[in-house]
């Protein structure tokens, strides 16, 4: 009887460890990023572009990971309200931040600053979420 209890306890501990490992793996997945051209002529015409793919992450998980990684996180709301468009004045260093949902799998965020504008486009597909960031200087 003690041997059965030992094996059941060991199995329970091993199973709990697997769940914890898979949960933390999803949280610690590094995004795969690529940047567009960085010469100033291109940036003034098209903006400074960066595209990052977050594998196996939902839009909300990606938003939180992106926000957490940024030093200017105060310019993004702490939480999302899926499907609800919002305009927020004077959030962090911004003049205005707009959240516009284009369906449940697409979110467009526009941050207006005194010195320019930054856009974030979140697009979800079955393999994860892509975020395109475009910074437009004045």
Tell me the role of every PLM-derived stretch:
Residues 1-10:
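Bacterial N-terminal signal peptides that target proteins for export
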Residues 9-18:
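Bacterial N-terminal signal peptides
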Residues 20-23:
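N-terminal signal peptide c-region/cleavage motif recognized by signal peptidases
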Residues 26-92:
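Flexible low-complexity loop/turn motifs enriched in small/helix-breaking residues
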Residues 95-102, 122:
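Short, exposed beta-strand/loop patches in secreted or surface proteins that constitute
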Residues 101-110:
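Short, hydrophobic/aromatic-rich segments at coil-to-beta transitions
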Residues 109-127:
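Short, exposed beta-strand-loop hairpins at the edges of beta-sheets
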Residues 125-138:
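Short, low-complexity, Pro/Ser/Thr/Gly-rich segments in the mature regions of secreted, periplasmic
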């Amino acid at each position: 009887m003690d041997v059965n209890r030992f094996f059941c306890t060991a199995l329970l501990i091993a199973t709990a460890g697997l769940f914890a490992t898979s949960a933390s793996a999803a949280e610690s997945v590094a995004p795969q990023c690529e940047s567009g051209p960085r010469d100033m002529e291109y940036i003034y015409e098209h903006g400074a572009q960066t595209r990052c793919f977050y594998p196996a992450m939902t839009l909300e998980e990606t938003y939180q990971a992106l926000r957490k990684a940024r030093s200017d996180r105060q310019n993004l709301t702490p939480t999302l309200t899926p499907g609800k468009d919002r305009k927020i004045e004077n959030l962090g260093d911004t003049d205005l931040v707009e959240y516009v949902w284009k369906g449940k799998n697409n979110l467009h965020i526009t941050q207006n600053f005194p010195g320019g504008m930054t856009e974030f486009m979140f697009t979800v597909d079955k393999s994860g979420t892509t975020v395109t960031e475009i910074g437009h200087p004045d």
